[in-house]
């Protein structure tokens, strides 16, 4: 089988820390990616006027790999795939890898939302039967392939998606006046400031937005470039698990400030962001779900896979679920 784990794999069973143990307020992080906090804090009139800026393609239901069992078990739920895109190497969305993958499931009756973060290096099966890292599906077949991959491997009933280019973080954070982040020392003891500043240079190059470099660790106020660089950091220990925690931390702070932002600020953000958002939600659907936002509450959250082994495969270092059925 293409992508079969080697005997050099390293087993890992991770304690339920981070995402799984966060408070309800901290779990609001993923709302930014899912229903887009901007949509639910702005007025309906503003959103409706700007909706034409949003792109997206319809999904073919026959190609989404939704099983009969998943269709039945998914009755009464809205399950949405959330993609944060890495489009640095391409001008087109097709070919971009999904740097962040989340699944949000809304119980339509109780209004409870459950969130799952799928680690980008997780080995999963694509529609052609080949195995590859989870973040490769978007590059190979766009939203349709990525959604089908999640449905096929995790027995889900996903028909909707939201995709956001990570570059929009820079503009959103700057429009909100920056965010406060505690930049901690690396788990493995290395000096991460040079690595952070390498990412700062990269973000400046890709967005054209200037920024000062990092000069220290600890609690500090970050601008859009700095916060995006922090969210992308892959060094310092903790592998992709620690990186996804940093991304959630940044998104949490954005959500907190966006909820308190003035309408003029939200309008400014929408002008910057909507051009970089893709979804197959219609305006009518979005407004219908947004009107109940105050009733939404967060339930169980976790990362996938919970139990895993790491292995060096044909597709590179990968995270392999040791018990896909239980995960």
Positions of PLM-derived features:
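Entry/capping segment at the start of metal-dependent catalytic domains
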Residues: 3-111, 288
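Second-shell loop/turn segments in exported
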Residues: 89-92, 132-140, 155-160, 217, ...
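Flexible, polar/acidic helix-loop-strand segments at domain edges
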Residues: 174-265
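Amphipathic, coiled-coil-like alpha-helical scaffolding segments used for oligomerization/assembly
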Residues: 140-207, 280-286
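Structured segments of extracytoplasmic/periplasmic soluble domains
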Residues: 83, 89, 109, 121, ...
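C-terminal solvent-exposed extensions
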Residues: 67-70, 77, 95, 126, ...
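Extracytoplasmic
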Residues: 75-78, 95-101, 110-118, 129, ...
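Extracytoplasmic/secreted envelope proteins and their assembly/folding machinery
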Residues: 100, 131, 143-151, 166-170, ...
């Amino acid at each position: 089988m293409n992508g079969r784990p080697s005997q050099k794999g390293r087993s890992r069973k991770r304690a339920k820390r981070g995402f799984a143990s966060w408070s309800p307020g901290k779990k609001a992080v993923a709302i930014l990616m899912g229903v887009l906090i901007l949509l639910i804090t702005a007025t309906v009139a503003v959103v409706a006027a700007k909706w034409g800026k949003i792109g997206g393609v319809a999904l073919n239901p026959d190609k989404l790999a939704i099983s009969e069992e998943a269709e039945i078990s998914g009755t009464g739920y809205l399950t949405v795939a959330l993609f944060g895109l890495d489009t640095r190497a391409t001008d087109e969305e097709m070919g971009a890898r999904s740097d962040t993958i989340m699944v949000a499931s809304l119980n339509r009756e109780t209004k409870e939302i459950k969130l799952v973060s799928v680690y980008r290096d997780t080995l999963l099966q694509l529609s052609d039967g080949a195995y590859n890292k989870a973040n490769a599906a978007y590059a190979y077949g766009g939203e349709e392939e990525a959604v089908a991959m999640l449905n096929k491997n995790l027995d889900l009933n996903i028909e909707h998606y939201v995709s956001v280019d990570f570059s929009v973080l820079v503009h959103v954070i700057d429009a909100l006046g920056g965010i406060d982040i505690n930049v901690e020392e690396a788990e493995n003891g290395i000096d991460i400031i040079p690595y952070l500043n390498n990412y700062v240079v990269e973000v400046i190059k890709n967005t054209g937005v200037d920024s000062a470099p990092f000069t220290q660790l600890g609690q500090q106020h970050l601008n859009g470039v700095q916060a995006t660089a922090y969210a992308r950091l892959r060094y310092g220990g903790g592998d992709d698990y620690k990186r996804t925690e940093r991304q959630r931390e940044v998104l949490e702070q954005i959500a907190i400030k966006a909820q308190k932002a003035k309408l003029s600020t939200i309008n400014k953000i929408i002008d910057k962001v909507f051009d970089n958002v893709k979804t197959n939600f219609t305006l009518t659907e979005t407004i219908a779900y947004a009107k109940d936002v105050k009733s939404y509450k967060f339930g169980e959250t976790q990362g996938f896979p919970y139990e895993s082994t790491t292995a060096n495969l044909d597709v590179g270092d990968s995270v392999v679920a040791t018990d896909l059925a239980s995960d």
